[in-house]
């Protein structure tokens, strides 16, 4: 990845709330399926904004280190009826589409949304808020901490 896109908590909440608005009216939804781990954060915002209390998880491991995607491993799958009909599946982003394709097979009738989308996977989700170039790594706020940054003159 040659570029980085740093997301702050404020930015993330703003984008997740925008996604929530697009999912109104809330009465059409039975619940949320959060894709662990990145989808847990937007799921919390969606649950609050839409007044939903039924939250399930699907746990898929694909990034085995910070930069490299590996073979998908389904660690846990939410058991919901009718292929996820009436459920929102949410993840933080769709990148190559590998995880999204697996999710689509598991929950073909769910509404699949993400906060961020890269070109290779964007067509696999029903809605998203922000376009991100394919060669850009997203630094999510839950992966960051506050730290001292030395002045440029000291490098």
Curated annotation (Swiss-Prot):
The entry marks the following residues as binding GMP, namely 95-99, 137-138
* Gene3D superfamilies xref list: 3.40.50.2020
Instruction: From the Swiss-Prot or TrEMBL record, state where the protein is found.
Output: Cell inner membrane
Membrane spanning stretches: none
Q: Which parts of the sequence bind Mg(2+)?
A: 92
User: Which residues make up the binding site for guanine?
Assistant: 95, 138
Q: What class of enzyme is it?
A: transferase
Membrane topology per the entry is: Peripheral membrane protein
Free-text function comment from the UniProt entry = Purine salvage pathway enzyme that catalyzes the transfer of the ribosyl-5-phosphate group from 5-phospho-alpha-D-ribose 1-diphosphate (PRPP) to the N9 position of the 6-oxopurines guanine and xanthine to form the corresponding ribonucleotides GMP (guanosine 5'-monophosphate) and XMP (xanthosine 5'-monophosphate), with the release of PPi. To a lesser extent, also acts on hypoxanthine.
Q: Which PANTHER family match?
A: XANTHINE PHOSPHORIBOSYLTRANSFERASE, XANTHINE-GUANINE PHOSPHORIBOSYLTRANSFERASE
Subunit structure of this chain's protein: Homotetramer.
Q: Which family does it belong to?
A: Belongs to the purine/pyrimidine phosphoribosyltransferase family. XGPT subfamily.
Q: What is this protein called?
A: Xanthine-guanine phosphoribosyltransferase 2
Q: What is the lineage of its organism?
A: Bacteria, Pseudomonadati, Pseudomonadota, Gammaproteobacteria, Pasteurellales
